[in-house]
Amino acid sequence: MPDKSWHLERRTFLKGVGVTLALPWLEGMSWSNDRGSAATPPNRFCTVYFPFGIADLTENDARAQFGWWPLGEGRDYQFSKTLEPLAPLRDQITPLAGLDHPAGYELGGHGTAGIFLTGGLRNKTRTLNRVSADQVVAEHLGRETRFQSLVCSTEGGVGALLNSNTLSYDRSGNPLPGIAEPSALFDMLFGAAQARQTLRTQASVLDRLLESTRELNGQLGAADRRKLDEYLFSVRGVEQEIVRARGWLDTPNARVDAAELNLACNIKNDPRAYLRVVYDLLFLAFQTDSTRVATFLTGNMRGESQYSAAAAWPKAAGVREEAHKVKHDAGSKPEDASRYDAFLLEQFAYFMTRLQDAREGDATLLDRTLLLYGSSNSTSHANTNYPLILAGGRSLGFKHGQYLKFPAKRVPMSNLLLTAIQRLDVRVESFADSTGVLSELT
């Protein structure tokens, strides 16, 4: 693990009366690489996904103000009521229309969250995904951080491929489980004792598993051995993470005062507080350089949304109907969908503002953090014309303050993902079904 050094210790703390607080970035804390020479602060990438689509109203509709899309286009666009929470951040965002994944056209309306960052499944039998864009970036940006990436999800775990609880998939197309509980996320990021215990448990389980599979392998036929080999390939990924974690055990965790965070909240008792504390933890993870890549799925696409975390969002926004129905009825009751989506955007704007208010040398964390916010549905779960917002990343060359509309079904969203990947200094020529980069963004 690289040894990071600063002119002042980066993880310097104020101590007193039993409280420990991590200091913010100070001018004396200039970045340096592992050889001690001056280096630019790191780039970061975060994707946030919301389920069930939007009120997809045309500009000629009398109720267009309650739709998702801005009115007008280019630099003269006007915010809809739905997007108004982002108005103070206008010069930091680019709403996008017309992009989607052609590979998702034939999937059911509830089946595309898992391909949002992958561009499409790997096989026609719909059993294997591709690597997600965040993991391509994490392989590059995550080399010098304690955690290669963070995977957050209101549901936790992985779900099913066509009903995913995670946005992140590894090189083999295997899902990476999301963390749902704020307290668990905090302990993972900042709890040194917890990290040691977790590592011991994981290592013990892995050792027993590998021993058992070695004994089993000799008893299996050829077909079963192939299946077992595929499984063990995934297990080796876990083994590599354990080796990685061991390399960081003697490096102190960044220390953050838990008393400043509402870790006890949950989605049911306080949806707004839940979203904000997850965003707080993502902010702290970036600020302390614990990771440089993160994803956050704010609800899966289960049709029975009363069993999904997404059930909490309409209630918090003052909408009586459950999440799934709100979006199915968005054409006839766009006001409800607007309040629902504006509530989620209000919390995303809170995250953006925290990043914007945090200075890092001659820029801000937001300038060096590329954010992608969106859904893989438009109206009534149609898998076309995704509602997308690109934000931040001005130090990476992104130019905001405009609304870009691309021709329908002509430009794959993979072009956006390729643009992001390349701007984050990852050397790739293509991603999924990309046909090029979006030069309009830079």
Positions of the model-derived regions?
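Ligand-binding pockets and gating/stacking loops
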Residues: 1-442
